[in-house]
Structure formats: C-alpha cells, structure tokens
C-alpha cells in the first residue's frame, strides 16, 4: 500500500504537467496555430504553422564556434535555463533552433530547461511568464542555484554561444 501511495505521489504531478504541455491557441493576427504555455521541442511538430520547418532548417545549418563551445561546456554545471519564446516570432524561429543546437552539442540536460511559449501580448496563462518581466522574445534566462545570472533578449550581441559563455562566467 505504501508503494502505491509513493508512486501516486510522484507520478500525479508529472502526469498533470505533461497534460498541460504544448497547448495550442490561435494567433489572432495571422489566424495560425501557436503554442502557448509550457512547451518542449516536440510541440514544434504539432502546430499548423511554419515554425517546425523553420526550426529544422536553422538547426541543420547552424555551426557552433568550437573554441567557445569548449569554454561553455565547463560552465554549465548547476545551470538552469528558462526560455520564453513564441512560435509566431521570427527571432524565435532563428535563435531557438540555434540554442537547441548549442545545448544538444553540449549534452545539456533538457530537464533543466523550462520553455514557455507566449502570445503576442507576451502572456501565457498558467505559467510563471508574468513574473519574468519579458518584453521581447525570445528571452533566454540563465540561473545558478535559483539566482538569475543574466539574459539574452531577442538577439544576442555576438554569437549565441559566446553570449551564454559571458553570462555563465559571472
């Protein structure tokens, strides 16, 4: 009986969270589907828009800077990332696949990544988005021990991996 209670206590939140993952809404401006709320990469394939094809194309062609990647790999320990993005956003279509490419090459644990897709008002009901003070997307927020280290807002100032390295060097 204790085992059943223990498994229920562990599995129920995971099931509840997964049911709210990759929710869809209609983008009123373009009348397209968009993701809203907590999402993951699998959600990109589920919406009726060009986000997934743009994502796949950008992911495929992006080449990381190897010297920077070596430095960055040493700085990822204990890092969590929150990504606020929008599937309707051109900058998200460009920078989110590059971010995933960087993290994939570094074998980043994607359980330490929270992705929130917002609408055109930068809102995502049922998420922490309102408390993050995000005005532009994508916004990449980097944390270590629940302390925000820095953000990349909309477009990096240099190569994305270089900006991440600078933030994680703090």
Set out the residue ranges of the language-model regions.
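Bacterial Sec-dependent N-terminal signal peptides
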Residues: 1-23
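Non-globular targeting/processing and membrane-anchoring segments
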Residues: 17-75, 165-170
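Local sequence-structure signature of Cys/Sec-based thiol-disulfide redox active-site neighborhoods
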Residues: 73-105
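Thiol-based oxidoreductase modules, predominantly thioredoxin-like and allied folds used
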Residues: 81-87, 110-124
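Generic recognition of short, well-ordered alpha-helical segments
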Residues: 94-97, 127, 162
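Short, surface-exposed basic-aromatic patches at helix termini and helix-loop junctions that form
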Residues: 101-107, 130-134
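Short Fe-S-cluster ligation motifs
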Residues: 121-135
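Non-catalytic, surface beta->alpha helical segment in thiol-disulfide oxidoreductase systems
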Residues: 136, 141-170
């Amino acid at each position: 009986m204790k085992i059943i209670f223990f498994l229920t206590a562990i599995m129920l939140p995971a099931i509840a969270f997964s049911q709210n993952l990759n929710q869809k809404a209609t983008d009123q401006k373009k009348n397209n589907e968009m993701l809203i709320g907590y999402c993951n990469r699998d959600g990109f394939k589920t919406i009726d828009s060009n986000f997934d094809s743009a994502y796949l194309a950008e992911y495929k062609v992006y080449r990381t800077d190897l010297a920077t990647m070596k430095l960055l790999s040493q700085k990822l320990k204990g890092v969590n990332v929150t990504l606020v993005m929008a599937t309707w956003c051109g900058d998200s279509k460009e920078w989110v696949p590059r971010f995933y490419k960087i993290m994939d090459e570094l074998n980043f644990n994607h359980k330490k990544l929270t992705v929130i897709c917002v609408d055109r008002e930068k809102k995502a009901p049922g998420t922490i988005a309102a408390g993050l003070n995000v005005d532009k997307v994508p916004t990449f927020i980097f944390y270590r021990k629940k302390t925000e280290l820095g953000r990349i807002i909309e477009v990096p100032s240099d190569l994305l991996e270089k900006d991440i390295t600078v933030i994680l060097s703090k």
